[in-house]
Amino acid sequence: MTTAPAISSRLDDPESARETGRAKIDWAFEHMPILSALREEFDANQPLAGETIGMAMHVEAKTAALVETMADAGAEIAITGCNPLSTHDGVSAALDAHESITSYAERGAEGEAYYDAIDAVLAHEPTVTVDDGGDLVFRVHEDHPELIDTIIGGTEETTTGVHRLRAMDDDDALEYPVFAVNDTPMKRLFDNVHGTGESALANIAMTTNLSWAGKDVVVAGYGDCGRGVAKKAAGQNANVIVTEVEPRRALEAHMEGYDVMPMAEAAEVGDVFLTTTGNKNVITRAHFERMDDGVVLANAGHFDVEVNLDHLSELAVSEREAREGVREYELADGRRLNVLAEGRLVNLASPIGLGHPVGVMDQSFGVQAVCVRELVANREEYAAGVHNVPDELDIEIAEIKLAAEGVEYDALTDDQAEYMDSWQHGT
């Protein structure tokens, strides 16, 4: 297979990059009590000794904390990016300097270079895969099926990846077990809602230097991510409009007090459009034709297919970089539509993208770490297919977080527990 070289050999000044990345990783670790606790436990018990972990993730400081936690547990790790624009090269270089880690991630790698890096990870013959978006798992199945027999299992971080895996599982095409980390409460209720809401809005505001107050903000999709974006935007005094295709979610958004309408109508009134659906062609030519001059378009879904930029380019008479991270498309009538981060994941792919807040990702990556531990320890218990994260693992992460926050909570008495498990007690 054609593979890419490690990041350190591709940088002009790898030592300087490592120093910058190391500082970012150390700062993240200082604010990640869950991973810090797991790192101490893993270092003592070596639960991943002898394993090789292949990863395709957003390679930035918080991810690096997860990578180093698993390396300290005894694993050899090979990692690359899961999005062409989300890698922080300094962080990648700092990881590559670790004796048990090889990093192939580099910002800007796309097309053939992107998949060469994935192939480089797979050349390490991983026994566990840790994925964000599903590209690593699908590359294994489509191009390197000879690796499947030695892969214990994997984990998937994000909504889009889980959707892809479930579709694969429905077709009986998924040949090893994968935990749907995205769907477990300690990830979904915090990372998807608070993480996406805060980081997407913060990155849009910093990239454009515009305020949310008084803006008509169109949120496409009212799943966990869209719910978080809508809540945070409303909290900054924006007027929130929600578009949906699922009637119950549309009703939920309506009952939460948001305006709900089809995208064709929202296109005529929105100032800022933010897609959170995980689907393609959410905003297309027909919508661009209705939009006002100066609108801002951004995507918080995993792939760059939600805002159809081919349609927009066909409509435009000129394009320019209006500001770093902002691509302006001028239409024939003089209207200008502004796309952030090339339509990619705005909270990570924008020039100032830092991703979700550290504390939120500590929870998600804590779940990732214990899921990998579980796969290795109990490898015979999981058949091929998508698996929910065992509830006891999710609770373990919640307990570590509460202890770190100094929060105490009640426990059921034996009598209460017996009552909850019984069916004989009626009126």
Curated annotation (Swiss-Prot):
Protein name: Adenosylhomocysteinase
Cellular component aspect of the GO annotation: cytosol
Pfam family for this entry, one: AdoHcyase_NAD
Native source organism of the sequence: Halobacterium salinarum (strain ATCC 700922 / JCM 11081 / NRC-1)
Pathway(s) per entry: Amino-acid biosynthesis; L-homocysteine biosynthesis; L-homocysteine from S-adenosyl-L-homocysteine: step 1/1
Family annotation (SUPFAM superfamilies): Formate/glycerate dehydrogenase catalytic domain-like, NAD(P)-binding Rossmann-fold domains
EC number: 3.13.2.1
Matches recorded under NCBIfam families: ahcY, PRK05476.2-3
